[in-house]
């Protein structure tokens, strides 16, 4: 049985082939007097393969009825193309129509807005733009695993259902099998979660960090890469309710080592995509963001500037720039502040470190000044924050005080405190939002357009 050849492989051929089988979807059909041109795409690459179907073919009448979107299997010869724009084309000997597409097929040969394509998310991967997005997404995921595996990290699967809130933000999706119309109650009238499936309140995870810390304190270097969930009612272009996170954790690692790895990681991902997704990136640079390639190279070519939070606030305050949100010590930097630092002041990526303890989670290591913690955020041009991390608090007594300050019950984190009781060790880690990185390397401005089926407030279609 003849094996099908991907379009990408056929186009990259170095010699003609007497027999080839290609399968895919018709992008366009053009009829001449004695033959038809078919543009065939199978998603393996951006370009389509031109097929010449002669009028002498026994089912030529069926071929002339092929609409955009129809699926076909074509057997023929791979020959040098007589036309411009492609090196090879297929001279068809048989054209089998696998699945017809009627005239209502919404992806006709014209431009479509991202807003329209979000409404047909089940079909939009067939468009040029979204085919590119999801090929880059696939390659980026591969590059992530490659980076950590080559450096001796162990890949850990952390739980999706959890009883802890790593960030302490309270923006959690609850998981329950209780009857919502008539839940069991305790004597005080509160819902009795002891009768729930897990016999306690449980949620979809917001982070795998705490569990990853447990494994780092045994395997030294680990990373997680999986879905996370936030019930944050933010209907913006940067927020989604379901997204993927990469979270490495390293034992015997301080803030300096953490910042070094984060910078190396970001550059590796950009370099890999620039090397392996050149054709797709060219489309983004042409139609999405004309500054994309220069911005990616800009990040690759420069060391990241490092500045303390205190210094960053002073720079922003003295800049004279009018911000929508005022700059003040003790508040989180807004996206406009982050972009000012990277795009106008330093003109390069920036790592901000040592934040006030009041605005960071309980697990971050307290500095000797008793005012700041060893937090760090990596900021890049065009996006702002792309990585957030810290050295973790390894001292049991200090961690317990941090939990009290954040009004967390130590009983809920007994296992986490055990990591400090039994062979504690300095350790660090960070989180990179996968979709945010994908937005950065493609120039796509809305997170809904880099997720296969976006989950946002008020929307869980498909």
What do these predicted ranges mean?
Residues 2-247, 251:
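Class II aminoacyl-tRNA synthetase-like tRNA-binding/catalytic domains
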Residues 143-151, 265-276:
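Generic non-transmembrane alpha-helical segments
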Residues 161, 171-271, 282-462:
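A translation/RNA-centric and nucleic-acid-associated enzymatic feature enriched
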Residues 277-281:
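Structured alpha-helical bundle/scaffold domains in large eukaryotic membrane-trafficking regulators
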């Amino acid at each position: 049985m003849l094996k099908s050849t991907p379009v990408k492989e056929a186009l990259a051929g170095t010699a003609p082939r007497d027999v080839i089988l290609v399968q895919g979807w018709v992008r366009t059909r053009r009829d001449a007097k004695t033959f038809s041109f078919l543009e065939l795409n199978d998603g393996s690459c951006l370009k389509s393969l031109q097929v010449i179907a002669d009028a002498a073919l026994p089912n030529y009448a069926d071929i002339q009825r092929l609409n955009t979107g129809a699926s076909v299997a074509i057997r023929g010869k791979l020959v040098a193309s007589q036309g411009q724009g492609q090196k090879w084309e297929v001279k068809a000997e048989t054209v089998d129509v696998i699945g017809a597409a009627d005239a209502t097929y919404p992806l006709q040969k014209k431009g479509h807005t991202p807003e329209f394509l979000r409404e047909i998310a089940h079909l939009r991967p067939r468009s040029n733009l979204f085919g590119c997005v999801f090929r880059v997404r696939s390659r980026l995921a591969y590059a992530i695993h490659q980076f950590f595996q080559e450096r001796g990290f162990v890949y850990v699967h952390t739980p999706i259902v959890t009883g802890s809130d790593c960030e302490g933000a309270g923006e959690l999706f609850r998981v329950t099998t209780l009857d919502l119309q008539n839940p069991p109650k305790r004597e005080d009238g509160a819902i009795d979660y002891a009768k729930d499936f897990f016999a306690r309140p449980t949620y979809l995870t917001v982070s795998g960090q705490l569990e990853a810390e447990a494994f780092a304190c045994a395997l030294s270097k680990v990373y997680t890469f999986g879905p996370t969930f936030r019930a944050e009612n933010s209907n913006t272009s940067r927020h989604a309710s379901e997204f993927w996170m990469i979270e490495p954790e390293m034992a015997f690692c301080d803030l300096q080592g953490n910042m070094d790895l984060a910078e190396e990681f970001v550059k590796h991902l950009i370099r890999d995509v620039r090397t392996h997704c050149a054709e797709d990136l060219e489309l983004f640079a042409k139609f999405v963001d004309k500054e994309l390639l220069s911005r990616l190279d800009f990040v690759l070519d420069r060391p990241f500037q490092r500045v303390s939070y205190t210094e960053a606030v002073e720079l922003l305050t003295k800049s004279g720039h009018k911000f929508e949100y005022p700059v003040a010590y003790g508040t989180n930097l807004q996206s406009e502040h982050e972009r000012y630092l990277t795009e106008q002041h330093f003109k390069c990526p920036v790592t901000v470190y040592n934040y006030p303890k009041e605005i960071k989670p309980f697990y971050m290591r307290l500095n000797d000044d008793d005012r700041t913690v060893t937090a760090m955020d990596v900021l890049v041009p065009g996006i702002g924050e792309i990585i957030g991390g810290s050295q973790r608090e390894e001292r049991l007594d200090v961690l317990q005080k941090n939990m009290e300050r954040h009004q967390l019950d130590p009983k809920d984190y007994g296992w986490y405190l055990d990591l400090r009781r039994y062979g504690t060790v300095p350790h660090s880690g960070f989180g990179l939002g996968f979709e945010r990185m994908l937005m950065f390397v493609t120039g796509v401005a809305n997170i809904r357009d880099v997720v296969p089926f976006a989950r946002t407030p008020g929307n869980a279609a498909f």
